[in-house]
């Protein structure tokens, strides 16, 4: 490379094949064509800082690939600053290809690898009130990341070498750029140096460090601009900041995964960081002993699952009385009947044979069979033909229905000794160690009482659910037999009446509940009307605050005139809103939402 007193910077400032997301960044082709060629050079600044001009843009060119910019950096103070930065920056000194060392060029590629064009906002008219006309292009800036894609900057001390990296640029335009550069060098005198605002430059560099997915976006811009690999671009570099040491094994290189990159307030081209920090705000810390106590209480109070009873043939009426008197042989030996007083016989009953012998019907006394005035309503089998029926399993309660029998409590289980880190290791001085334990224990007790109440209500509902609210007689199965003492067509018996125990007195919360109407009656129409007035889920979901559908567009004022400019630098636009953090929920409310939802869904369902 031929050494030169200035550094050239070229690149696309707008690519039609990669349109930007923001409407204000779109450039009208007719407007751009009317503004070219430039009547005078445009200022070249750093990060759109008006008090940091470092050179001039001597031409903007419309090519088939997009709007192309060519500029030169002539500020002596800025070039000296680049030399100092290079010696202290490890990323600037890293190279993937064996290229000649260029401290200024390599420092620029590591610090300001993108171009940004500042143009007039499309909503602002170009004609002023006094009849003047505003220039559409205001200035071009070198920045850390542009808001338009494909705006990668290529620096170099040789203009021909810089233009060679853009394969989408027409040779005719490249030749025109070289001619304009020579003419601008002859016309321009000694460049004026302005003192650099170092504080602002450092602030912009800090903002650029929090751009989300900056390295990945720079790689994308490089691909859109179609720039080959033999350049000083740092977008694909992964610098090894550790000195090589053969004696010690070097650790693995730092990850460049976009998910691990930081983000910050860098304008519309980036989003603020902190997405992963909100993941732990919904968690609470519970001591291990408290958690194990809650888990044990849950297991102790959980009712056992009721296994379905094996299928058996239907039993004749009052067969349990015959099974109780069965001899010591046969399937019914040893069966125990329930306590008496559960059934009353208004007429007669048929007890059936005792041992399963068909001839036992003839040997039975006459009083063992009592005719009934009505014929049997159904036919279920022949008692005694296949032997006595299987024994009736024992029942609990005042009706023929199995109830839940809670398992014995594990009160004799050895309690774990409290650990030091659980009792006082995670607490600050003066903090009560039983604060969370009392809240959780009280909540667990309330949940257990509610579950027992719901189970009692469910058992009562299932007990009387087949006959409505009233205690109507329960009709049992009827049987016939064709033996000498069997039922004849003109004979019948009356169904035994079921006399249950009186129901328990209703509690306060049970009495307040409305009883369902008995079968055969029509529910009042007011219930249907009330259901029709229930709001839908979609309406309830939309009851929250609505977002503003017409947000005000941000405006950016020009640095030396009252124009509204559009700056295409991602790090030059600060976010107007800070990420809102959700309010922390109280401990009791959060615990209530966890345990109520988990325990009630598993037990009551």
From Swiss-Prot:
Domain of life, source organism: Viruses
UniProt keyword annotation of Hydrolase present: yes
Phosphoprotein is among the record's keywords: yes
GO cellular component: host cell cytoplasm; host cell nucleus
Residue ranges of the region described as Interaction with major capsid protein: 585-605
Molecular-function GO term, any one: identical protein binding
Active-site residues annotated for this sequence: 48, 116, 139
Chain intervals for the UniProt region annotation (Disordered): 235-274, 403-431, 489-588
Enzyme Commission number: 3.4.21.97
Site residues (Cleavage), renumbered to this chain: 235-236, 568-569
Entry's family note: Belongs to the herpesviridae capsid scaffolding protein family.
Domain topic, free-text comment: Region of interaction between pPR and pAP is called Amino conserved domain (ACD). The region of interaction with major capsid protein is called carboxyl conserved domain (CCD).
Family annotation (HAMAP family): HSV_SCAF
Name of the protein in its database record: Capsid scaffolding protein
